[in-house]
Amino acid sequence: MSLTRLLIKDFRNIENADLALSPGFNFLVGANGSGKTSVLEAIYTLGHGRAFRSLQPGRVIRHEQEAFVLHGRLQGEERETSIGLTKDKQGDSKVRIDGTDGHKIAELAHLMPMQLITPEGFTLLNGGPKYRRAFLDWGCFHNEAGFFTAWSNLKRLLKQRNAALRQVSRYEQLRPWDKELIPLAEQISTWRAEYSSAIAQDMADTCQQFLPEFSLTFSFQRGWEKETDYADVLERSFERDRMLTYTAHGPHKADFRIRADGAPVEDTLSRGQLKLLMCALRLAQGEFLTRESGRRCLYLIDDFASELDDARRGLLASRLKATQSQVFVSAISAEHVIDMSDENSKMFTVEKGKITD
């Protein structure tokens, strides 16, 4: 699907905007602080229910307003879908799909698979394991129908188990939680392992094109010892968990390690190379989704020119065009993106929250 129309009301510094969009490349050009990143963030929020620069709703609602409103029209091969999201300062959300309320944010995420590339996105590579778990979980969410429910239930059970660890004195008192937790943990870990294995060749091929000077390897670590039943791990670590008052092993501790020439990528690659690797991973993930399901991602790229020279920008642009996906790119100057433009592209100018084409 592609986003054919976007309406923004009271989001960041944007009072009102009504944008007719290209199914190909859409460029947002403006000075720092003009609001171009806010447009990308509005699209992201419409598909995720939250902004990527702040988790606090009050910070993305325009000054002295009570709520933001986002609305979009998605065009698929056979039908058009209308989607909307309203969120107030208390964080209460209302999701509307095709004119009906009561929908879940997960439904928006399913309708709008998207890949986000920002200057802060290096956390995928040099941040904590939670960022790499999120990378795998994006793929599992879009490839396994039961993943979201299973992961939601797992988080609920872990929260309850951690609370119980403060109260119990014997492991037997935890068995009611672990009886539900264990099969969920094993299923989620299986899905993650299968996904990381299935996408490995796509990642290797794309990374080879972007970073041919390195040999990159990928490994999934499930969050507890190999060849060990999760039930045994939970029982054996009970005393330590009780002392820590949290569950020290499980899918919530998994990681997806990426190494270049045998060393962690964050210790080996320059910032420009890290950005190329991040782009390669996002592209590989989007292309894998298209091949497996026929669905295409939306790509959101903030500050396209940062960290990349002309040759690397050209390589990224050509790969994005080859996906035949909808792409949104922000840049300070039109000179940085003009060579990516074609007859189907749209160029928007952003100034103090006002957007013109």
UniProtKB/Swiss-Prot annotation:
* Keyword entries, A-Z: ATP-binding, Cytoplasm, DNA damage, DNA repair, DNA replication, DNA-binding, Nucleotide-binding, SOS response
Q: Where in the cell is it found?
A: Cytoplasm
Under the heading HAMAP family, the entry gives: RecF
Q: Name one GO molecular function term.
A: single-stranded DNA binding
Outline what the protein does: The RecF protein is involved in DNA metabolism; it is required for DNA replication and normal SOS inducibility. RecF binds preferentially to single-stranded, linear DNA. It also seems to bind ATP.
Which residues does the record give as ATP binding sites? 30-37
Please give the biological process terms from Gene Ontology that the record holds.
DNA replication; DNA synthesis involved in DNA repair; double-strand break repair; SOS response
Q: What is this protein called?
A: DNA replication and repair protein RecF
The answer on whether this UniProt entry bears the keyword DNA-binding reads yes
Q: Describe the family membership recorded for this protein in Swiss-Prot or TrEMBL.
A: Belongs to the RecF family.
The family database entries (Pfam families) matched by this protein are listed as:
SMC_N
Q: Which organism is it from?
A: Salmonella agona (strain SL483)
What's the chief localization of this chain?
cytoplasm
Q: Which GO terms describe its cellular component?
A: cytoplasm
Q: Which superkingdom, per the lineage?
A: Bacteria
Q: Please give the InterPro entries that the UniProt record associates with this protein.
A: DNA-binding_RecF (IPR001238), DNA-binding_RecF_CS (IPR018078), P-loop_NTPase (IPR027417), RecF/RecN/SMC_N (IPR003395), RecF_2 (IPR042174)
